[in-house]
């Protein structure tokens, strides 16, 4: 049996939107490929080969998204008392006062460029956050090295 993929509601919706965009791209890539095949005298044409490769990449992305979505289990919003999958966590460095906001998500949703930063529950940082409560101080491995953070707030 295929393993379930836990997603937040927003993550599920974002992946559905990506799937729709990829399907639109596939239609366009198919149209371009057909036009190239009809106009090409030489089937070894590099433009034709590039179009075939692009179509294959899009199809692979669609397959991947469909697989993830078919196994998706949408998470219920948490109580906000304990950090779990889907929780948005406000952290503060007790020494500098620097604040950091992260959301603990499944690997399928992880994206450090999002705001708040989406951290995989399978990552070292994600694993370290799980189960903590407001007021807890924990040591996290960050790009700046090991740092102490205090949990200031937990949402969802």
UniProtKB/Swiss-Prot annotation:
Residues 1-74 form a coiled coil. Keywords: Coiled coil, Transcription, Transcription regulation. InterPro entries: GreA/GreB_C_sf, TF_GreA/GreB_CS, Tscrpt_elong_fac_GreA/B_C, Tscrpt_elong_fac_GreA/B_fam, Tscrpt_elong_fac_GreA/B_N, Tscrpt_elong_fac_GreA/B_N_sf. Changing residue 77 to C: Strong inhibitory activity and insensitivity to pH. Inhibits all catalytic activities of RNA polymerase (RNAP) by partially occluding its substrate-binding site and preventing NTP binding. Inhibitory activity is regulated via a pH-induced conformational change of the structure. At pH above 7, Gfh1 is in an inactive flipped orientation that prevents binding to RNAP. At lower pH, Gfh1 switches to an active orientation, which enables binding to RNAP and inhibitory activity. Interacts with RNAP. This is Transcription inhibitor protein Gfh1.
């Amino acid at each position: 049996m295929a393993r379930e993929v836990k997603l937040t509601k927003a993550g599920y919706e974002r992946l559905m939107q990506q799937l729709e965009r990829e399907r639109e791209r596939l239609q366009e890539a198919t149209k371009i490929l057909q036009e190239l095949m009809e106009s090409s005298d030489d089937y070894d044409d590099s433009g034709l080969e590039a179009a075939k490769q692009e179509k294959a990449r899009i199809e692979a992305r669609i397959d991947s998204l469909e697989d993830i979505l078919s196994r998706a289990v949408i998470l219920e919003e948490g109580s906000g008392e304990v950090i779990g999958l889907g929780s948005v966590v406000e952290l503060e460095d007790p020494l500098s006062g620097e604040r950091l906001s992260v959301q603990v998500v499944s690997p399928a949703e992880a994206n450090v460029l999002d705001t708040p930063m989406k951290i995989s529950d399978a990552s070292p940082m994600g694993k370290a956050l799980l189960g903590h409560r407001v007021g807890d101080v924990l040591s996290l491995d960050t790009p700046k090295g090991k740092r102490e953070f205090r949990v200031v707030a937990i949402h969802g």
